[in-house]
C-alpha cells in the first residue's frame, strides 16, 4: 500500500469528472501522518454520497523542486488538505496535521452548496 502511495504522490490526478470542488493534498514521501491522511481521503471518496459528484483531488509532493513554494509554506505542517470551490480561490479552507473523514465530508458538502 505504501508503494502505491509513493507513486501517486508525484503526480496529480482527477478522481471524478467536471470538478466543482477541488481538494489539494500536500504531503511528502516517508511521512507516516501523510500515509494515514491519504487513507482517510480515500475513505471519503468511497462514500456513496460522493460517487458521481464533481470533486477532484491533486496530490502535491512538497519535496519536489517545482513545489518549493509549498515546502516553505508547509514543511512543518504536513499533511495539509486544501478544499476549495473551483474558480473561487477565496473559498479555500485548510485542514492541517490530522484529517478526519467527517470533517472533510462536511467541508466538501459546504463547498458544493456555495
Swiss-Prot record:
Keyword Transport: yes
Gene3D superfamilies named in the record: Glutaredoxin (3.40.30.10)
Family indicated by similarity: Belongs to the glutaredoxin family. YDR286C subfamily.
Cysteine disulfide partners in this protein: 31-34
Record-linked Pfam families: Glrx-like
Protein name per its UniProtKB record: Glutaredoxin-like protein YDR286C
Entry keywords, A to Z: Disulfide bond, Electron transport, Transport
